[in-house]
Amino acid sequence: MKKILKNVQPSIRAYLGLACCYSIIDEQAFTSGWVYDKYIHLEYTSYDSQIKYADYEHYDFVSAQGVFAKSFIEYPYDFCSETILCEYICKMLDEGEYCFALWNETIITNYLYEKQNPGIYEHGCFVYGYDKDKKVFYTQGYFDNENWEHAQIPFEIFYEALSYCPEKGEIALIGYREIPDYEWESNIPKICLLYTSDA
């Protein structure tokens, strides 16, 4: 069984904790210019043909605009087996929820690039799909050399990366579900007020 949630293509390369949301919001927000005009600053690097960075004018994009329904769950570490965790993430994806969490990205880059780097690099991860037959999660991010990549991470490696710190006592997962039929509206009076107050 396989489930892959939509991603706007090309993906907007940005800081994972929040801006990966740009990969999953309604395409209308982009085609209308609303997101680019209001929130994103992009930097294109010609040497590798990538849109490498996105940032916010307003940091509260996700919470303030009502674009997403957000969920949060913490699993007690002692009861959080690979099977339980991976099944729960698959269930989130089945219900249309994208998964965000913290992992030890050193484990991921060691797996992807056959390296043996030591240490912990705590970083956000973004999961948008799975394949139970292959036992992999689909993810994307800056994994190596500042290049944005899509990757398939085996359940076993994924669990190892998420369970890197038993001292925390739990493994936390954040889910984002796009609100259906969200209407992107410009608040023209508010925009005019902002411009006239700066003059």
Region roles according to the model:
Residues 195-199:
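Conserved small/polar residues in nucleotide/adenosyl-binding loops
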Residues 183-191:
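Non-catalytic accessory segments flanking enzymatic or RNA/DNA-binding domains
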Residues 2-181:
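Conserved active-site-adjacent core of cysteine acyl-enzyme catalytic domains
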